[in-house]
Swiss-Prot record:
The keyword Methyltransferase does not apply. GO terms for cellular component: cytosol. Required for maturation of 30S ribosomal subunits. It comes from Listeria innocua serovar 6a (strain ATCC BAA-680 / CLIP 11262). Keywords: Cytoplasm, Ribosome biogenesis. Belongs to the RimP family. The gene is rimP. PANTHER family: RIBOSOME MATURATION FACTOR RIMP (PTHR33867:SF1). This is Ribosome maturation factor RimP. Coiled coil: none annotated. It is found in: Cytoplasm. Signal peptide: none annotated.
Amino acid sequence: MSKVLEQVEAIVAPITDELQLELVDIAFEKEGPNWFLRIFIDKDGGVDIDECAAVSEKVSEKMDESDPITQNYFLEVSSPGAERPLKKEQDFENAVGKYVHVTSYEPIDGRKMWEGTLVSYDGTTLVITITDKTRKITCEIPKDKVAKARLAIQF
């Protein structure tokens, strides 16, 4: 995480804690000529527009005070959505039994992408059951080899 994102997280985390919300992720991204500071929040049952607005107002006020980002940017606060990223240990633990999409830095048993049910997670290894054509396969993926992981929608 960059120094700017660490400073932003130090501002945002107390606000989400105060509002009893989970800070899922923070991204600072350039799209075309514009910069966007995106803050993703959640709670059991999901967040509503009023909670996003409350976080946005409080974060905007605190960011103006400490000003960790010098250039102009747009602030966006939203839910992570149905395909929520899995980043923290708790995210992986909560995803056990759910359908996930995982990519790795390098091939493992000839694959770099898996989409299936996360059967277990022990802190070091993800065990995923995938369907390959008509058969079920159980795959073990070391956590340190995971490039990205997120919840997925099963069709």
